[in-house]
From Swiss-Prot:
Residues 1-2 form a propeptide. Its EC number is 4.1.1.39. The gene is rbcL. The modification N-acetylproline is found at residue 3. GO terms for cellular component: chloroplast. This is Ribulose bisphosphate carboxylase large chain. It catalyses: 2 (2R)-3-phosphoglycerate + 2 H(+) = D-ribulose 1,5-bisphosphate + CO2 + H2O; D-ribulose 1,5-bisphosphate + O2 = 2-phosphoglycolate + (2R)-3-phosphoglycerate + 2 H(+). The lineage of its organism: Eukaryota, Viridiplantae, Streptophyta, Embryophyta, Tracheophyta. The record marks 334 as: Transition state stabilizer. The basic functional RuBisCO is composed of a large chain homodimer in a 'head-to-tail' conformation. In form I RuBisCO this homodimer is arranged in a barrel-like tetramer with the small subunits forming a tetrameric 'cap' on each end of the 'barrel'. GO terms for molecular function: magnesium ion binding; monooxygenase activity; ribulose-bisphosphate carboxylase activity. Binds 1 Mg(2+) ion per subunit. It comes from the Eukaryota. Keywords: Acetylation, Calvin cycle, Carbon dioxide fixation, Chloroplast, Disulfide bond, Lyase, Magnesium, Metal-binding, Methylation, Monooxygenase, Oxidoreductase, Photorespiration, Photosynthesis, Plastid.
Length: 475
């Protein structure tokens, strides 16, 4: 044995596979205000103790590897390691636990959602000791959140820009999502905005395809914006999707939108990536553009109940990366969303301070300090009969987006927009008068339809439309 080996062995080095519990399971640890805290729902493989599984999660998402290495002695692992500080069984589930892990702040690059997620979820989800793993929540300490600029503008600044207060904003996704020419697309935008909507929207997969190149779409949409503004006296917007194959092309599209005088652009933040999203948010902040965020691909990540990342984590990450709107489900309609859980992450998007509330899926108290809030967007299979519930559930600081619920009106696009605007104004007025939207919603819509033929036609065509499916995508 060489002298070097003898010296290293003499101070406790021992090669071989690690027992993670010895180093990374620390139930006596008191969390610090500066720690990033994570709640993982874990399902260990048969025969793997929960403590070993929780410690493995902490190790593999911080300083650990599968064996002891010589270079461990060149740093202070105790300073930099993640710690599994608590484990609790999940009620009603066999062999499933919530593991709480604390990460020291120095593990993360300032202002980088990309680095934060790469560290916490980048590798550990493929660990063989775990049958399934889901990141349920993160606590972002103010010491870290203050290194992010967050939304380009936020809720209050957007309302001031639009001069619209005291009600939810109304939007519409142009359909069919693919296949329209730029001129016909612009025509649909104009008709919807003229009818009373605040926004129209590119669908998430509208980029720059052969049937409609992005520059042509931007030009015809800008014409529709200015014409509808002149006729209605209201500020209008269309979410021009700047998402592209490269960051350089994305920025070129955003610059062109600003030069046209458009008030808002859009990005698919999960498929486009957090680095691209943060770069676009910086540009929007510096140049007075609002930024609408679509969550395309989110269900691939968040829909399984036992494996993946819960959307509340993706929502927090978006608030840090930057966006003024983000799609957040509906509770009603065709897209999945449980009411209390949905309202939990809606509050995490909008509010400055959110208390821990396990009944709503909020595992940690979150203090955003002064970071601006994000408008939650409700969309997907909604129509005028849903308006009372949406107004009551989401409140004023939200965007209610009706695609088929506008363009599917039997009289055309503009009457569809009129029907939605009348229904919204009726619900807001009824609420302000003290009426119960949850109990009297249908009656409020029927009363309004008596003096709005557009709303009456919408009520008739969608009176029997419901989306009632049980969630079956569980492990």
């Amino acid at each position: 044995m060489s002298p070097q080996t003898e010296t290293k062995a003499g101070v406790g080095f021992k090669a071989g596979v690690k027992d993670y519990r010895l180093t990374y399971y620390t139930p006596e640890y008191k969390t610090k205000d500066t720690d990033i805290l994570a709640a993982f729902r874990m399902t260990p493989q048969p025969g793997v103790p929960a403590e070993e599984a929780g410690a493995a999660v902490a190790a593999e998402s911080s300083t650990g590897t599968w064996t002891t290495v010589w270079t461990d002695g060149l740093t202070s692992l105790d300073r930099y390691k993640g710690r599994c500080y608590d484990i609790e069984p999940v009620a009603g589930e066999e062999n499933q636990y919530i593991a709480y892990v604390a990460y020291p702040l120095d593990l993360f690059e300032e202002g980088s959602v990309t680095n934060m997620l790469t560290s916490i979820v980048g590798n550990v989800f493929g660990f063989k000791a775990l049958r399934a793993l889901r990141l349920e929540d993160l606590r972002i300490p103010p010491a870290y959140s203050k290194t992010f600029l967050g939304p380009p503008h936020g809720i209050q600044v957007e309302r001031d820009k639009l001069n619209k207060y005291g009600r939810p904003l109304l939007g519409c996704t142009i359909k069919p999502k693919l296949g329209l020419s730029a001129k016909n697309y612009g025509r649909a935008v104009y008709e919807c905005l003229r009818g009373g909507l605040d926004f129209t929207k590119d669908d998430e997969n509208v980029n720059s395809q052969p049937f409609m190149r992005w520059r042509d779409r931007f030009l015809f949409v800008a014409e529709a914006l200015f014409k509808s503004q002149a006729e209605t006296g209201e500020i209008k917007g269309h979410y021009l999707n700047a998402t592209a194959g490269t960051c350089e092309e994305m920025m070129k599209r955003a610059v062109f939108a600003r030069e046209l005088g458009a008030p808002i652009v859009m990005h698919d933040y999960l498929t486009g990536g957090f680095t691209a999203n943060t770069s676009l948010a910086f540009y929007c902040r510096d140049n007075g553009l609002l930024l609408h965020i679509h969550r395309a691909m989110h269900a691939v990540i968040d829909r399984q109940k036992n494996h993946g990342i819960h959307f509340r984590v993706l929502a927090k990450a978006l608030r840090m990366s930057g966006g003024d709107h983000i799609h957040a489900g509906t509770v009603v309609g065709k897209l999945e969303g449980e009411r209390e859980v949905t309202l939990g992450f809606v509050d995490l998007l909008r509010d400055d301070y959110i208390e821990k509330d396990r009944s709503r899926g909020i595992y940690f108290t979150q203090d955003w300090v002064s970071m601006p809030g994000v408008f939650p967007v409700a969309s997907g299979g909604i129509h005028v009969w849903h308006m009372p519930a949406l107004t009551e559930i989401f409140g004023d600081d939200s965007v209610l987006q009706f695609g088929g619920g506008t363009l599917g009106h039997p009289w055309g696009n503009a009457p569809g927009a009129v029907a939605n605007r009348v229904a919204l104004e009726a619900c807001v007025q009824a609420r302000n008068e003290g009426r119960d939207l949850a109990r009297e919603g249908n009656e409020i819509i029927r009363e309004a339809s008596k003096w709005s033929p557009e709303l009456a036609a919408a009520c008739e065509i969608w009176k029997a439309i419901k989306f009632e499916f049980e969630t079956i995508d569980t492990l």
